[in-house]
């Protein structure tokens, strides 16, 4: 008589050690799981709710300045080191891991208008209202030695901004004109100007390092090529641009922070139309900085808040504010893409998480797997109304909330007026202008 025995491979169900998880046999046939999508929807909903529960972005406040913080700079080689300049001429160097000030320098008389680090991280440069450019060592002086700058350049006009070349011993300053300096000389290598108004900010391109951009008080954004020693082109907007920031991953993309509450992302090869208009702030945007990934940027505003925008979206994904934070003057995204720093005029530097609900520290493999799974579920169901409402909800200060409502009413009134004008005019006599093109006045080459 023949008897057929069931045989199973123990490797498929036996644990190697008692610490391993029990192996559960699964059949992935969809006919056996008719409620798979409803289950995933509930999981996505719970993951979205938990994300809002654990959204606690504020980490630390670095206090010590005796006047408003006017500018920030990152160390190019060290994640933990940050430099800040204040309105009383004081420069402080901070250690983010210990969250304390490790060095204080009385650098200028009056405002510190700009601060930047050398590409190798051995020194940094400051400019101030006292018409000087000073170079300082990154390491402090020895015991008993006085704090002295390495070099001091006496200028003829007030400098309003400074930025260092990403690869060479060259830096640029701006004021009445854009000056390109060699570190070994006391006179500028070349000076470039276009128009007569003062220039508030200058920034080198991190990829095409010979390109730089500046923004002036006459509403211009001017692009320069160091190799030509002449301006390339400029775009004139409706209102003044406070500063610009280049995308660290896409060579010809930059974002401008404007006085009309918006940010404009441009492609320098087609300046007549912005790539994207970013709208959410309710007051002038004062500073902008990209994340190292080039996918997002953070903006600082006069409305006492900072916002994080995806590059390809017109609305912000996150808004940060505190009860004590006043007008935010400067903002930086750290080089590891995990943290954001902002300096405001009530003398504090605040440290935030880039992802509000992110768990800090080392994650176990199961935590990583659960996090990735929840993230995929949230992306899959992100457009469902209930999940979308929970994910978008933010608590805002009453001042910002009321201003948002007011701006919404004004925008709707303008739209209604424009529709009525088109309706009661001869067909084709009133041009329809898109939101992107409304704010660009002209492009001059």
UniProtKB/Swiss-Prot annotation:
What's an example of a GO molecular-function annotation for this chain?
ubiquitin-like ligase-substrate adaptor activity
Name residues in a coiled coil. none
GO cellular component terms, A-Z: Cul4-RING E3 ubiquitin ligase complex; nucleolus; small-subunit processome
Q: Which UniProt keywords apply?
A: Acetylation, Nucleus, Repeat, Ribonucleoprotein, Ribosome biogenesis, rRNA processing, Ubl conjugation pathway, WD repeat
* Renumbered residue ranges of the record's region Required for nucleolar location: 353-441
Q: Which GO terms describe its biological process?
A: decidualization; maturation of SSU-rRNA from tricistronic rRNA transcript (SSU-rRNA, 5.8S rRNA, LSU-rRNA); oocyte growth; protein ubiquitination; rRNA processing
Sorted alphabetically, which Pfam families does this protein's record hold? Sof1, WD40
Q: Which Gene3D superfamilies match?
A: YVTN repeat-like/Quinoprotein amine dehydrogenase (2.130.10.10)
What job does the chain carry out?
Answer: Part of the small subunit (SSU) processome, first precursor of the small eukaryotic ribosomal subunit. During the assembly of the SSU processome in the nucleolus, many ribosome biogenesis factors, an RNA chaperone and ribosomal proteins associate with the nascent pre-rRNA and work in concert to generate RNA folding, modifications, rearrangements and cleavage as well as targeted degradation of pre-ribosomal RNA by the RNA exosome. Participates in the 18S rRNA processing in growing oocytes, being essential for oocyte nonsurrounded nucleolus (NSN) to surrounded nucleolus (SN) transition.
Official protein name in the record: DDB1- and CUL4-associated factor 13
